[in-house]
């Protein structure tokens, strides 16, 4: 892998105190932005939208797309859905969320991408749009005076360019001139093999104003993990959505591919999107911790809700046939929803922490999941557990792989 210096077309993103179209207009002119990418996530988490000159975006009253963008699968084929709107394929209107304006640093000219919400012809939110699904869950928390906090960890593989799907994916050649073949988890030398891609990731993330906590080598050959800072659930879902595209572009710039398939290579561990979750009350206190610093009933009930309801959410956490190839015993992936303290063999892990940082890690979600839908599902399950006071099963102290499987096989 040749060492390349990142070429950045726009190295900074808007940081507007109270974003509105006029302040964004001034920023666009000051930074000589040429193009705007109007994007919205589909069910697969793919960015769908339109690209237009900045001047057109600033004067455009409405931007529209056909509703069929939500009925296309990851291959582009339309799902067999009996929905009347699919037959007429009418328009939906995009509404820009100006707080999401970010540079497109890999573009040939200065460009911004802006995530949009979508409404129907009556101006009502499209209920099944991924951001709206997550927003409804967050409103349920808000009605109780709670605020969920999440921190995603996103795993992915770097591979050699592969243009023929009949051939298996292979690790790329690193800076040493060799392919990675074995497990080198947490090896700094393994990370250094792909320092060109990682440098591009860091530079692109800085240009987009995205915070990276850490980047590590995972257990697979050329498998990396990006850990994100904890924060607001919608903002973090937006960041995962943006990061996937950013990482793919960084890899392409360095002559390799990045894949978020749950199980891209036989014999190698799969890729997950682990999500750490906690809940704050109106005073900003972690509801998972009691006043004496021990675990609270809300902590137990949150876990109980995840155990009760996450199996029904499997299509959101593991959306493809390939997703279930990841869930294999002794391959760094859970096969059930047991929980335990600092136990990575369970689907739900309670990491070691102080009372303020007490949280529950969902280790079931695959890297191929739509971040909005997966985060909505895991938070909804925990919410129902707290509201219904669902008691969890006893914590597992040892390995959980041989416990009864309660996650589906397909």
Predicted regions: what they are:
Residues 185, 189-194, 198-212, 226-233, ...:
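Accessory "access/gating" subregions that flank catalytic or transport cores
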Residues 103-110, 148-149, 215-219, 268, ...:
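Short glycine/proline-enriched loop/turn "hinge" motifs that connect secondary-structure elements
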Residues 114-120, 224-230, 277, 362:
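Short, hydrophobic beta-strand segments
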Residues 41-46, 154-160, 218-223, 263-271, ...:
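A glycine-rich phosphate-binding loop feature that marks nucleotide/adenosyl-phosphate handling sites
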Residues 149-157, 173-188, 208-228, 258-276, ...:
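Core alpha/beta catalytic barrel or barrel-like domain that forms the active/cofactor pocket
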Residues 2-11, 242, 249-250, 256-258, ...:
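Catalytic-core signal marking the mid-to-C-terminal active-site face
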Residues 230-241, 265-266:
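Active-site neighborhood of thiol-dependent amide/isopeptide-bond enzymes
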Residues 2-214, 236, 373, 407-410:
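ATP/Mg2+-dependent ligation/transfer catalytic cores
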